[in-house]
A protein has these predicted regions:
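Acidic, contiguous segments within the catalytic cores of piggyBac-derived transposases
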Residues: 31-34, 38-54, 248, 257-273, ...
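Charged, often Cys/His-bearing segments associated with DNA-binding zinc-finger transcription factors
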Residues: 1-60, 65, 73, 103, ...
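Polybasic low-complexity intrinsically disordered regions
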Residues: 56-72, 76, 80-86, 90, ...
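Helix-centered, glycine/charged polyanion-binding patches within enzymatic domains
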Residues: 7, 14-18, 209-282, 290
Length: 322
C-alpha cells in the first residue's frame, strides 16, 4: 500500500497513456503456452492410474466403474478442446488407442449423468497466507442466440445465463474460490458461500460496489479480512465496528469520489479478477453446454480446474518499460 496520500499524482482522476511492459520470462512462458495443446498435459499419469474406481466392500449399491477423476478429466478435455460429450468420448478413446493403454473413456451418457453429482476439485496445492484476494463475477450463457444475431435481428428467444463467481489470488493469479449460481442471485448473496470455501489466512479482499452490503462486510469481519469495497455514491456511515468501510466513506466525503481511496489502498489490484474473467471467455468460451444445472456446475468447475492448471504451468512476468 502507498503510505502517504500526498504521493497521489495530480492527474489521478484523468486517463493516462497506456503503459508498456516487457515479459522477462518469455522462454518459460512460451513453453507453457505450447504445453497447453499437449494431450498428455491434460490426460496425465495421475488420471490414467486412477481411471477406474477402486472396489470398496463396505459400500452399498452398484459400484461406480469410473472414478471422479476420470469424469473430471473428460469434462476438462471437453472444455479445453471445445468438444461435445460424444466427440470427447471418441477423442479420448483414440488417444488411449494410440498410447496403447488398456482403458476406455466413459460413455457420453455416463459422463452426462455423473456430472450431476461429481465433485470437481480445482484447488491447487499452494498453501500459506494470501495478501490480497480479488473477487468478481461474470455471466456464462446456457441458452439463446449469439450476440451478432441479437444485434442484427433483435432478441427472439429467451436467453438463460448462469453467473460464475471467482475469488483470485492477486499475486499468483490462482483461483482460490469459485461458485456457479442462477442469474437472479446477486453478487452479494453469493459472496459468503464463496469466501467460506477457503480456510487460508487472507489479509485483504477487494470487490466492486455491488458487494457494499452488510452481508459481505459481516463475512469479512468474521474472517478478520480487511475489506476493500468502494462505498456507493452518497453512502452514510455504519456503526463503529465497520471501520474499513467508514474510512472509505470519510475519504469519499472529503474528496468527492472514491478515486483517492482506491489509489491509496491498492484497490485497483481488483483488475486481476477482471483478467481472470477475460481468460475464461477467451480460452473456454462464454457458454455452458450441459442442460442440467448440477451438470453445469461441474462443467464450470472443470473450466476453473483447467484455468488453474494453465496458471500453475506458467504465467508471464513483466516489467514496465514505458
Amino acid at each position: 500500500m502507498k503510505d502517504q496520500i500526498t504521493h497521489l499524482p495530480d492527474n489521478a482522476d484523468r486517463s493516462v497513456a497506456k503503459q508498456k511492459f516487457k515479459i522477462t520470462n518469455w522462454p518459460t512462458y512460451n513453453k507453457a503456452l505450447i504445453n497447453r495443446g499437449s494431450i498428455t498435459f491434460w490426460l496425465d499419469d495421475e488420471a490414467i492410474q486412477a481411471w477406474y474406481e477402486s472396489a470398496t466392500l463396505s459400500s452399498r449399491g452398484r459400484p461406480q466403474r469410473y472414478s471422479d477423476l476420470a469424469i473430471t478429466t473428460v469434462l476438462v478435455i471437453k472444455r479445453v478442446f471445445r468438444l461435445t460429450l460424444r466427440a470427447a468420448q471418441g477423442f479420448i478413446d483414440s488417444i488411449f488407442s494410440l498410447m496403447n493403454v488398456p482403458l476406455r473413456c466413459p460413455d457420453y451418457s455416463c459422463v452426462s449423468r455423473r456430472a450431476k453429482s461429481v465433485n470437481v476439485s480445482f484447488k491447487t496445492p499452494t498453501r500459506g497466507e494470501i495478501a490480497h484476494l480479488v473477487i468478481d463475477s461474470t455471466g456464462l450463457k446456457v441458452f439463446g442466440e449469439g450476440e451478432w444475431k441479437v444485434k442484427k435481428h433483435g432478441q427472439e428467444r429467451r436467453r438463460i445465463w448462469r453467473k460464475l463467481h471467482l475469488a483470485v489470488d492477486s499475486k499468483t493469479h490462482e483461483i482460490i474460490c469459485a461458485d456457479l449460481s442462477l442469474n437472479n442471485v446477486t453478487d452479494s448473496e453469493a459472496f459468503p458461500g464463496l469466501i467460506r470455501q477457503t480456510h487460508r489466512k487472507i489479509r485483504a479482499a477487494s470487490a466492486d460496489g455491488a458487494y457494499d452490503t452488510r452481508l459481505c462486510h459481516d463475512e469479512l469481519r468474521r474472517k478478520k479480512i480487511s475489506a476493500l469495497i468502494p462505498p456507493r455514491k452518497g453512502a452514510g456511515y455504519w456503526p463503529g465496528e465497520y471501520a474499513d468501510r467508514n474510512r472509505a466513506v470519510a475519504n469519499q466525503r472529503m474528496t468527492g469520489s472514491n478515486a483517492r481511496w482506491k489509489w491509496t489502498t491498492d484497490y485497483n489490484r481488483r483488475s486481476i479478477a477482471e483478467t481472470a474473467m477475460y481468460r475464461v471467455k477467451q480460452l473456454f468460451g462464454g457458454s455452458l453446454t450441459l442442460r442440467d444445472y448440477d451438470g453445469q456446475v461441474a462443467e464450470a468447475m472443470a473450466l476453473v480446474r483447467a484455468l488453474n492448471k494453465m496458471t500453475k504451468a506458467g504465467m508471464p512476468e513483466s516489467v514496465r518499460i514505458a
